C-alpha cells in the first residue's frame, strides 16, 4: 500500500510502493523510486536512476533523476526539475525554476518553468532545456535545445 514517513525516506537501492510514497521531508534512493499512485515530499525527491508514479509527483524543493521522470498525472516542484533522460507527464509540469533533461519532454497539457512566487527568477531559471518538447504547450519558460 502506501509508504508514509514523517521525515526522510532514504534507500541504498530502490523505493517501491503499490500505492503512494509520502515523506514530510525528502525522498532519496540510490536506484529508482516507483509508486502505483503518487510520490510526494515536503523537500526534495532524488533517484540515481528513474522516478515513476502512476499519478502525480510533487516536491516542495527539487526533483532529480539520473534517468527519466514519468508521472500519470502532473509533475510539480518548488525548485527545479532535472532528468538524465526524458520527462513525461500525463497532465503538465510546473517548476519554480528551470526544467532540464537530455531527451524529450512529453505532456498532455501545459509546461511552466520559473514560476516561483517568492522572488523574481533570472532568465536562466526560466529555461526548459531538452532535445524537443514533443507534446504540450509551453505556457511559461524559454525552451533551449539540449
Predicted regions, residues:
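Long, distal/terminal scaffolding or interaction modules
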Residues: 1-146
